[in-house]
Amino acid sequence: MKVIYSAVAVSAIVLSSAASAQDTRRADLLRQRAEIDAQLAALDEAPASAPAKPVEGSPGDVIVTGRALSLTTQVSGQTVTTIGDDAFRNTPATTIADIVRLSPGVTVIQGNGPRDVGVSIRGSNARNGFGARNIQVFEDDFPVTQPDGLARFDLTDPHAYGAVDVVRGPSSARYGNYALGGAVNFRTRRGRDIDGIELGVDGGSYGYVNLFGTIGHAGPRYEYAAFGSFVRGDGATGHTGYQTGTINAYGTYALGDHDRVAVKVIYNEGEFRLAVRSSYNQYLANPYQQGCAVAATAAAGCGTISVFVNGTNGTRIAQTADEGDLARNDRRTIVGTRYEHDFGSDTTWRTQATFDSRVVNQPTSATPFKGTLDSYNITSDVTNHGRIAGMDATSFVGLFYNYLDNQSFSFNKTPAGRNGFGALTQTVFGDIRNLGVRAREELQITPKLQLIAGIGAEYSQIKMRQTAYTYPVGANPVLALVPANRDFWNVAPETAVFWQTTEAVRLHARIGTGYGIPQNGQLFVTSAGVAGNNSDLNAQTNVGVDVGAEIAIGDTLKAEVTGYYEWYRNELVSQSAGVNLLAYTSNVPRSIHRGVEVGLAWRPLPGTKLEASYSYNDHYYTDFSERLTAGATSAVFSRDGNAIPGVIPTFVNARAVYDQPSGPLRGLGGFVEVTYRDRYFIDNGNLLAMPAYTLTNLNLHYDPPGRRFSLYASVQNLFDVTYVGSASVIANSLDPATGLQNPASVLSNVTGSIYAGQPRTVYAGVKAKF
């Protein structure tokens, strides 16, 4: 009985203390609300031109904020969409495709490996089968696109991110080289939001497991967050198992009232087994490459490569991906630091330096590739917040320099599996340098009208040398040297107007320009798909016009619509010459990219939300003739008016969400998501098209207030649709007997193009916070 009485007494004390704590907390909240209301009233009474009062705080406040003009967040003068982590927090988020496809104007395809993703903004990367080209990619405003123009997403785990910013349209005035399509910035979660330790595990079909954790905290002068994960899976397609580990950390520290530093670290290492890209007919016969262990007894539709028996020349034999053990083993290390200093309350100087090392070992085909690509990126700029002619103005000027040291090797493959490297076929040594200046002015003409103008100028230098080796049977090896010493000068202006017509409607119009020099790998592959001289490629450029509107009615309705029209010159188009050959690149003199982008977020009832993004892309050649050759027969074909291959004309993503807003089941919810992709061509002649498809995803989750514990279950591709997940652009060919192009029935046998998309997959995950 004594124990019972003691328990009752303790319970009474706890309950009374809890009640007292609640009363105290309520009083504090009411006091804070009164202070906020008073400050808002003071702002309403102040003149529109009054400068903003500097942020002040008590010793417990966290005020480690940058004052320089951000490259990618809260962007003015661009067409931009931000995706918060509430859209993907309770989903599998196995790749960044699960995030960026929620933005209008963005399409995604599977890349070279289970974690690799090809990302296109307005079709920017549609002719490339992996990674991202023709856009700039950042993490926390640190560059992760190397100076050769390539960004890859194997190193990213979406669980690390709190938001993603997608900037659409030509943007070289702001981002420099390769920003023809725009930019993407991944923002890691902040220490103040984590405030402790979070641990989680996801599991799913085909052996998928993701173990991840985050630690974060913030204090009066510092803030940090560190994320780590280990992911593995067997893959639905044969020979696509993988395992990869990621570390991603970001921290800031205020040295004083006027000085701040930030540090960024990313490390990723992964081992990814790869299937052979199929022809369309192979895909139809065996989409997931099952029964393909041995070429001699392989099932119908199995893809193979052809390797020299001796690794040098002579007789070749066929090998499946299993026999050749095709794979990628890549390591990426990025370390960056940023320093900001305030010259008074209006002017900030910022300097940033980033080291980026990419070490690759890629026996992915009959010509394995190894290389080390180390790069350095330095920027320094000044931002001033002041007034010009009585108008609020933000002025920006900056310098930038980046450098890539390329050391790469290609080999013939032998039959000896993953480490079967035979005779050397080429080496590429050299460097790429980019040096430039950019300036920007943002003027608040009236409280509702803003004018933005910017310009960037850049000098780029490519100094590379290829040494190519061939091994004729019964003769001495032949060595050929191909130098590529190229200089490029590019200037990119832009201007934009934003007009807040009413409290709910904002209109914008923008003219932007972009440019991108050839990548070093494109300079050394001929149209025959072999190593050789292709160093006369030109830089591609574009000029684009955006016109659009944004509607925001409280938290109930947010919508955006943008129409764009872009003129391209010397567009770089890559094509596959076959599974045993290298992809080659050519310039297209003139082409047009135009389309419409729509985004919607509507909350018709408490707890309900309808999200949708729609992209329409009409991209076509206006001046392009292509020569095809077969033996002694050669013919030229006009591609004028043809759709640019690889570009998906219509892409729709819609999600209907319900989350219980109150009561004991608050945080319980789910959504149904539908994705539609239109039919698209994969050749310049527009003869072979990949079929359209629709996917349906189902999600249930429980994420209560406080987020101490959450869980989800998800079914991706609910109806188990078989679809083309990725299709590299293929080359057209000529019938020597007729002098005509070979039809779709022949192109359907061209290998080296297609990966099937993921079949029905079930996931579940749980997270806990301490």
Each model region followed by its residue ranges:
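Face-selective signature of the C-terminal outer-membrane beta-barrel domain
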Residues: 260-266, 326-472, 482, 498-500, ...
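C-terminal beta-signal and adjacent terminal beta-strands/loops
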Residues: 513, 675-681, 702-770
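Extracytoplasmic beta-strand/coil segments of soluble accessory domains associated
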Residues: 65, 72, 97-142
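Gram-negative outer-membrane beta-barrel transporters
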Residues: 459-460, 564-568, 586-683, 767-769
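N-terminal periplasmic accessory domains that precede
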Residues: 96-99, 118-122, 135-139, 152-154, ...
